[in-house]
Amino acid sequence: MAPRGSQRTVNKIVAENRKARFNYEIIDTYEAGIMLTGTEVKSLREGKANIAESYASDEGEEIWLINSHLPEYLQANRFNHEPRRRRKLLLNKREINRLRVAINREGMTLVPLKIYFNEKGRAKLELALAKGKKLHDKRETEKERDWNRQKSRLLKTG
């Protein structure tokens, strides 16, 4: 019989928003819990989620994850969840206030970076406070990435 701790998935990344780091300049990151139903957790454990087009929004005293897609759990019949429903994010009051100030006054955006399971087996969302990049900034990032690839190729051959 396996030890109890080995059955858990430690920091298993379920979904990652890879375009976020290209489209936004990441200022700060936060770890937030997600309020999920049972079938949503089971769907996440299967590794099925998409947060590519999702974003977070503040409404009142709460922060919500909007437009994230968690597909229905196939073994659940009539008690399934809606795949694109809004999900409440669990943050400290102090963190929520700090994020609201940054969004409203400084014109920043809340972008989800990845969904993963922590050591305790709880689903967490890595949320980034970000500023949108302009087109020339994106081109500059792409040029820098290409130059780094060329440098690594030259170092391997020479």
Curated annotation (Swiss-Prot):
<feature type="compositionally biased region" description="Basic and acidic residues">
    <location>
        <begin position="137"/>
        <end position="149"/>
    </location>
</feature>
<dbReference type="InterPro" id="IPR000037">
    <property type="entry name" value="SsrA-bd_prot"/>
</dbReference>
<comment type="function">
    <text>Required for rescue of stalled ribosomes mediated by trans-translation. Binds to transfer-messenger RNA (tmRNA), required for stable association of tmRNA with ribosomes. tmRNA and SmpB together mimic tRNA shape, replacing the anticodon stem-loop with SmpB. tmRNA is encoded by the ssrA gene; the 2 termini fold to resemble tRNA(Ala) and it encodes a 'tag peptide', a short internal open reading frame. During trans-translation Ala-aminoacylated tmRNA acts like a tRNA, entering the A-site of stalled ribosomes, displacing the stalled mRNA.</text>
</comment>
<protein>
    <recommendedName>
        <fullName>SsrA-binding protein</fullName>
    </recommendedName>
</protein>
<feature type="region of interest" description="Disordered">
    <location>
        <begin position="134"/>
        <end position="158"/>
    </location>
</feature>
<dbReference type="Pfam" id="PF01668">
    <property type="entry name" value="SmpB"/>
</dbReference>
<dbReference type="GO" id="GO:0003723">
    <property type="term" value="F:RNA binding"/>
</dbReference>
<keyword id="KW-0694">RNA-binding</keyword>
<comment type="similarity">
    <text>Belongs to the SmpB family.</text>
</comment>
<dbReference type="InterPro" id="IPR023620">
    <property type="entry name" value="SmpB"/>
</dbReference>
<keyword id="KW-0963">Cytoplasm</keyword>
<dbReference type="InterPro" id="IPR020081">
    <property type="entry name" value="SsrA-bd_prot_CS"/>
</dbReference>
<dbReference type="GO" id="GO:0070929">
    <property type="term" value="P:trans-translation"/>
</dbReference>
<dbReference type="GO" id="GO:0005829">
    <property type="term" value="C:cytosol"/>
</dbReference>
